[in-house]
Structure formats: C-alpha cells, structure tokens
C-alpha cells in the first residue's frame, strides 16, 4: 500500500531507448501521455515512433548516445565520444535536432565516460543553446557526471534522474519497488524523476500503477513541466545533491 501524498508531490517518468523495437515502442506509446518518451535518433524506428508518440500527446526527447566507461570502444551509430572532433560533435547533434524538430529536450544514453568531461559537455550545451527552449536531463549513469552543472552554466533548463526503474528489466517486483522509491522521494522533496525502458515488465507495472497515483495525491507531468515546477519548489536546486540510484553505463 502506497501512502497518499500531498498535492505538491510531482513525478516525471521518462521511457528512453525507443527506436530499436517497433512493437515495444508502440507499447510505450500506449502509456499515459504525461509519460515522456525519448528516442535514440539513429535507430531504425525512431522517426515512425516519434511521430506516433506526438500523435498520442507525449512529450518527445532525444536520447543522445554517448561513450561509456564500461564499454568505451562500443560505438553505436551517432555516438558522441572523447575522440569526436568539436565540429563533428556539434554537427551530429544539429542533425539529430533537425531530424526531430518536435523534440523538447535531450538526455544521455550511456555516457558514463563522456559526461565526466566538461569540454564535451560544453559543446553539447552550446549546441542546445542555439535552439531556444530545449532542456537537458542528466541520466546520471555515473556519480562523477558534471553534465547538469555545465547545463546550468549555459542557462540550459535542466534536471537529473533520481531513480532507475528497471535495472532488473525482467523483474516486475523490482520495478514496483523502484516506483515506490520514486514516490517516497517525491513525498520527501516535493518532486522526483525516474527513467525506465520499454521492457515488458516496466510497461506492465506502469500501466497498473500510474492510473492510481492521482487518487493518492501524486501529479505526473512531462519533463518540461517538471523542470518548471522543480525550479519553483527548489530555487537553489543542485543536481549534484539529488538523490540517485546510479548505474554505470
């Protein structure tokens, strides 16, 4: 049983990694439209799924592939890496943004290596700043990330992930536990953000639990609205002090 929260308890949920499976992506799109969806921009089904997501009223993000610590040599299409030249780095991001003009913001896919490097994060924020209104979400795939801090230096609206819903992607009980952890955090600080993926277990649990949350005093909002609310609730919010359950990628 989840205890009721005050009306000020706001949560936001991102389902990212969309684009490689059409069927799983379509199931994610059937979630309540307050759930924000983030597509891998060079994946085979990204364009089709993004169009369907927008049609169903979801806010759309781009899930930017970035180099990781755990597998630094594995570069999927469009991965931003330490050895990417500044010009190529910015051109790649510009291409993604041009291909998905409805995107309202970006978050990092993997990136436990790249998000530690201020120069590369500065290139990212400089590019985002050219597109007024875009926000950045630090997925916090490492506790050493400085990405959100750099976003703040460039006045990019930003926030950070608090909870990963599905570190155990096939375990429904684990997803429920993580969602309850998100709700507890939202009660404690007034707001909390989770990232999940289009795994069958995750989709099933969210379909079961999300419709009940309004009656328990929680408000589910898209990420753009979440950032606005967070700034009002916590004018001195520091992403580095955000509670996290980090998972290295």
Where are these regions (language model features)?
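Terminal interaction modules at protein C-ends
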Residues: 1-9, 176-180, 217-220, 224-227
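Active-site beta->alpha N-cap acidic-glycine motif
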Residues: 6-72
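Active-site groove signature of glycoside hydrolases
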Residues: 94-114, 195
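C-terminal domain-boundary segment and adjacent tail
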Residues: 128-138, 142, 198-249
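Hydrophobic faces of well-ordered beta-strands that scaffold small-molecule active sites
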Residues: 11-15, 35-37, 58-64, 106-108, ...
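Alpha-helical scaffold elements lining the catalytic groove of polysaccharide deacetylases
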Residues: 75-98, 115-120, 149-187
């Amino acid at each position: 049983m989840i205890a009721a929260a005050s009306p000020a308890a706001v949560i936001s949920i991102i389902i990212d990694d969309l684009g490689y499976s059409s069927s799983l992506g379509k199931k994610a799109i059937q979630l309540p439209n307050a759930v924000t969806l983030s597509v891998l921009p060079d994946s085979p089904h990204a364009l089709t799924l993004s169009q369907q997501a927008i049609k169903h009223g979801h806010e759309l993000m781009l899930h930017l592939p970035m180099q990781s610590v755990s597998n630094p040599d594995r570069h999927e299409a469009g991965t931003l890496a330490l050895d990417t030249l500044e010009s190529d780095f910015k051109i790649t991001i510009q291409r993604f943004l041009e291909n998905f003009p409805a995107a309202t913001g970006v978050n990092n896919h993997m990136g436990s290596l790249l998000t530690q490097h201020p120069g590369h994060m500065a290139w990212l924020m400089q590019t985002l700043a050219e597109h007024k209104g875009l926000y950045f979400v630090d997925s916090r795939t490492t506790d050493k990330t400085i990405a959100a801090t750099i976003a703040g230096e460039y006045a990019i609206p930003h926030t950070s992930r608090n909870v990963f819903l599905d570190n155990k992607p096939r375990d429904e009980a684990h997803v429920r536990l993580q969602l309850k952890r998100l709700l507890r955090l939202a009660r404690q600080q007034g707001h909390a953000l989770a990232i999940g993926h289009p795994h069958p277990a995750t989709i099933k649990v969210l379909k079961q639990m999300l419709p009940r949350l309004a009656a328990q005093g929680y408000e589910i909002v898209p990420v753009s609205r979440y950032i606005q609310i967070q700034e009002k609730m916590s004018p001195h919010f520091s992403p580095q002090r955000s509670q996290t359950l980090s998972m290295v990628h």
